[in-house]
C-alpha cells in the first residue's frame, strides 16, 4: 500500500493509537480521491494480516524502549494504574508485555470484526473535493461494508477518589516528581477553564511552574504538564511533572508546586495574563486548522469525542468566556488532597 500511495503522490502515510481511538491518515492530490476510496475500502473490507508476527515484534520492542528501558515510562505506567481503579484509562495504550506475547492472529481478527464496523468508523476528508462526489464514491466503494451495531461496551465509571493516592519507584535515574488531579471529560462545561489552568501552570517557559521551579528556585531541570491525560473523551487527569535539579528532592518540588496551585485559589489571575493565555489557546486551535491534514484531524477529534465537529468552533467561544472567577472556582474544587495522585521516582541507591 505504501508504494501505491507514494507513486500516486501521497505523503504522510501513517497510523497511531491513543487511549480512545486508532487513526489512519495520509494526504493525496485532490484528483486521487477515487484511489483513496479504493485503498481505504480495501483496508477495511478485505484486511490481510500477513505481517502479524513481524508487527508483534515491533510492538514488543517499542514497549521495551518506551517503558521497560525507560524509568519515567515505568513511572507513568504505575502512576496511571494508581490513579484509575476501574476505568480502561488505567491500561497502557501499547498494552502489557504478556498480553502482547499471548496475542494471536485469531484474537486480532475477532477484534477487527467487532470494532472495525461502519457504526464505529468516522472519516474526515478535507481539501479541494466536491462533497457530492465524495458521497458518490463512498457509496461505490464502501456500499458493501456490512452494517453492524457498535460493540455494546459498558465502560465502568471511575469512583470518586476520597484520599490522596501515592506511588513510589526506585530506579537508576535522576528523581522525578508527578502530581495529578481528576477532572471531567472534554464535554464538560468547564473544559476550557481546565485548558487555561493547564496552560497557565505548565505550558512552556512562560508558565508559572517553569518560572518558579526552574528559573527562580532552581529546583527542577524541567517542569511541564498536561490537561486531559491520558485521554479526554472520558473523565481524566490534569497532570504535572518535574525532573529534579541535582541536589534537590522530590519533596521540595511538591511543596513548590502546591504553592503555585494555592495561588490559583487565592489570587485572581490578572487581566493581562488571562488575555495572553486566551490568545495562546485560540491560536493553538486555529493553527491546527492551517493545513488540510490538521483540519481533518481536529474536526475528526471533536466529532468522535464530543458528538459534533461543530463543537471545535464552540470551544473558541468558551475560551473567550473564561474569567478569573472561573479559574478560582475550578481550582478550589479540583486541587484538593482528596483528589490528588502523587508519583515519586527516586534514585536507586547503590547496593
Residue locations for each model-derived region?
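Bacterial peptidoglycan biogenesis and beta-lactam-recognition machinery
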Residues: 45-50, 130-132, 142-148
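Hard-cation-handling environments
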Residues: 291, 314
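Short amphipathic alpha-helices in soluble, non-transmembrane regions
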Residues: 37-42, 136-141, 253-259
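Non-catalytic beta-strand/loop surface segments
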Residues: 1-32, 65-120, 144-188, 199-249, ...
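Short beta-strands and strand-coil junctions in structured, solvent-facing domains, enriched
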Residues: 45-46, 131-132, 184-188, 247-250, ...
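Short, polar/flexible loop-turn hinges at active-site or ligand-entry regions and domain interfaces
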Residues: 43-52, 66, 269-270
Amino acid at each position: 500500500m505504501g508504494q501505491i500511495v507514494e507513486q500516486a503522490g501521497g505523503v504522510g502515510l501513517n497510523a497511531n493509537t491513543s487511549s480512545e481511538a486508532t487513526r489512519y491518515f495520509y494526504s493525496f492530490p485532490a484528483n486521487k480521491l477515487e484511489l483513496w476510496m479504493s485503498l481505504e475500502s480495501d483496508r477495511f473490507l478485505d484486511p490481510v494480516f500477513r505481517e502479524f508476527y513481524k508487527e508483534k515484534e515491533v510492538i514488543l520492542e517499542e514497549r521495551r524502549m518506551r517503558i521497560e528501558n525507560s524509568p519515567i515510562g515505568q513511572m507513568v505506567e504505575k502512576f496511571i494504574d494508581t490513579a484509575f481503579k476501574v476505568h480502561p484509562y488505567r491500561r497502557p495504550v501499547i498494552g502489557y508485555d504478556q498480553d502482547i506475547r499471548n496475542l494471536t492472529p485469531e484474537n486480532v481478527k475477532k477484534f477487527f470484526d467487532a470494532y472495525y464496523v461502519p457504526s464505529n468508523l468516522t472519516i474526515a476528508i478535507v481539501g479541494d473535493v466536491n462533497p457530492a462526489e465524495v458521497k458518490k464514491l463512498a457509496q461505490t466503494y464502501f456500499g458493501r461494508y456490512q452494517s453492524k451495531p457498535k460493540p455494546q461496551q459498558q465502560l465502568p465509571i471511575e469512583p470518586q477518589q476520597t484520599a490522596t493516592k501515592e506511588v513510589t519507584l526506585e530506579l537508576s535515574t535522576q528523581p522525578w516528581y508527578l502530581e495529578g488531579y481528576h477532572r471531567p471529560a472534554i464535554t464538560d462545561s468547564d473544559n476550557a477553564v481546565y485548558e487555561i489552568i493547564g496552560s497557565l501552570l505548565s505550558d512552556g517557559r512562560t508558565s508559572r511552574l517553569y518560572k518558579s521551579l526552574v528559573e527562580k528556585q532552581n529546583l527542577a531541570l524541567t517542569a511541564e504538564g498536561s490537561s486531559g491525560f491520558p485521554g479526554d473523551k472520558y473523565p481524566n487527569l490534569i497532570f504535572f511533572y518535574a525532573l529534579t535539579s541535582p541536589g534537590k528532592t522530590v519533596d521540595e518540588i511538591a511543596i513548590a508546586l502546591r504553592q503555585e496551585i494555592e495561588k490559583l485559589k487565592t489570587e485572581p489571575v490578572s487581566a493581562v495574563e488571562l488575555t495572553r493565555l486566551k490568545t495562546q489557546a485560540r491560536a493553538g486551535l486555529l493553527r491546527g486548522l492551517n493545513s488540510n491534514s490538521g483540519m481533518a484531524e481536529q474536526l475528526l477529534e471533536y466529532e468522535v469525542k464530543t458528538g459534533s465537529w461543530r463543537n471545535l468552533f464552540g470551544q473558541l467561544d468558551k475560551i473567550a468566556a473564561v474569567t478569573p472567577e472561573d479559574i478560582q472556582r475550578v481550582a478550589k474544587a479540583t486541587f484538593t488532597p482528596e483528589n490528588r495522585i502523587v508519583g515519586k521516582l527516586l534514585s536507586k541507591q547503590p547496593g
